[in-house]
Regions:
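Alpha-solenoid helical repeat scaffolds
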Residues: 57-59, 91-92
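Solenoid-like repeat scaffolds
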Residues: 45-50
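Short, low-complexity, Pro/Ser/Thr/Gly-rich segments in the mature regions of secreted, periplasmic
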Residues: 399-413
Length: 413
């Protein structure tokens, strides 16, 4: 029998003197699928005493997991499938959900609502994480975390398998295919530094959603939507779907759609305030990354660290070293990013002799035209004189991070 919300809250209240322990255990149990789904224990943790920092942290973790799960459920419901070649740069359409044999129709307006709901869910997770104080710790096995995308508890997706699939170019596992194996044991001990880190990721994801919702991309959706969602709304054009007498095939049409999609990326601004909000969220991401590192560098323990300091050796992630020079390089890179977002430094363009003011791109937005940005024409209204981050800045960032800038940026946030 599944415990009631009242019972969960009562068990936490009874053990309040133990502070984070029982609440952390409840959060870990929910994350690992050993108890009720994310939402019910998150509500119970919200009802815990104000001083229970394990409850605050656990609620934030569960709300983040629930946000990702709800977004994945929406993608499954509408049959999200393998991104076509050349369209993998669309980050919110790369979630490898199982194939849905009976997808529902999807309109442009419904897709915007899905993104808005994801943004709202991330905001709730971030708000809970922002209340965490002290140094609570939640220990759990990342590979035991499962997400229910299909509505069938028997088909929950393990986080480890999800990560493994995303490493395979975001290709979902088709019916009958073997699941790629994730790590067998991925135990972590999330602490205060990780609470700040996850807040930052909430902001980073939210910035991308704010950018999308700031623009009208309905034409692009109409062109390429069917390649992602089988029943997406599209113009009634009699395209070839199989080989015809001229040798043309449906696959040739897929390539043509990608070309048309790129041409259609000239998105009008429909909600300009969201562009300013995206900039603020990016600045918050930078501030939280700094705060996270300040906390990490002050830690004296050493237990299954998600992001270890140079002095911590028991790391849950071991694909890249964390040395004093790497940390210093990352913090210096954050300074450049912040300067660009504030307009203190300009951003260079391969074709222009001046830099452009990135802050004004957000605060004084114009239609986003991908081709014109690539050619430099779209940067013209924002050109200015001043210190500029050009290609040498990229080389410097990469050198400071041991040649692995992108990997560290994804990990460190």
């Amino acid at each position: 029998m599944r415990p009631s919300l009242a019972a969960l809250a009562f068990s936490i209240a009874l053990s309040a003197p133990a502070l984070a322990g029982p609440s952390a255990d409840l959060a870990a149990s929910a994350l690992e699928g050993r108890g009720p789904a994310f939402e019910q224990p998150a509500q119970a943790l919200r009802a815990a005493p104000a001083g229970d920092q394990g409850a605050r942290f656990g609620e934030g973790l569960l709300l983040f997991a629930r946000a990702v799960e709800r977004y994945g459920q929406a993608q499954y419901r509408h049959g999200l499938r393998v991104p076509p070649a050349g369209a993998g740069f669309l980050p919110f359409l790369r979630m490898p959900v199982p194939i849905n044999p009976s997808p529902e129709p999807l309109s442009y307006e419904a897709q915007r609502k899905t993104l808005a709901a994801f943004l709202d869910d991330l905001g709730k997770a971030k708000a809970a994480l922002a209340t965490v104080e002290g140094d609570p710790k939640i220990r759990f096995d990342m590979n035991a975390v499962t997400l229910d995308f299909t509505g069938d508890p028997a088909r929950r997706v393990r986080l480890g398998d999800l990560v493994a699939q995303m490493q395979m170019a975001g290709r979902p596992t088709r019916p009958g295919a073997a699941q790629p194996a994730g790590p067998q044991d991925w135990r972590v001990a999330f602490d205060r530094g990780d609470a700040l880190w996850l807040q930052g990721y909430c902001n980073l994801l939210s910035a991308g959603i704010e950018f999308a919702l700031a623009h009208d991309w309905s034409e692009s959706f109409g062109i390429l939507g069917r390649q992602f969602y089988p029943r997406a709304e599209a113009a009634a054009i009699p395209f070839v779907t199989a080989r015809d007498g001229r040798g043309m095939t449906g696959a040739d049409g897929d390539i043509a759609d990608v070309v048309a999609f790129i041409h259609s990326i000239r998105w009008p601004v429909v909600e300009p305030k969201r562009m300013s909000a995206a900039r603020e969220r990016l600045l918050e991401t930078i501030a939280l990354s700094r705060a996270s590192w300040k906390t990490i560098l002050a830690e004296t323990d050493d237990e299954r660290e998600w992001i270890p300091s140079p002095d911590q050796k028991d790391a849950a992630v071991t694909f890249a070293p964390v040395t004093p020079s790497i940390v210093d390089g990352w913090l210096a890179t954050l300074g450049d990013f912040e300067a660009a977002l504030k307009g203190d430094k300009l951003v260079g363009h391969w074709r222009l002799t001046k830099g452009f003011d990135l802050s004004k791109v957000f605060t004084q937005p114009r239609p986003f035209d991908l081709v014109l940005w690539a050619s430099g024409h779209a940067a013209a209204p924002y050109l200015a004189d001043g210190p500029t981050l050009d290609s040498t800045a990229w080389r410097r960032w990469n050198a400071l991070l041991g040649g692995g800038f992108l990997g560290y940026a994804i990990w460190f946030n």
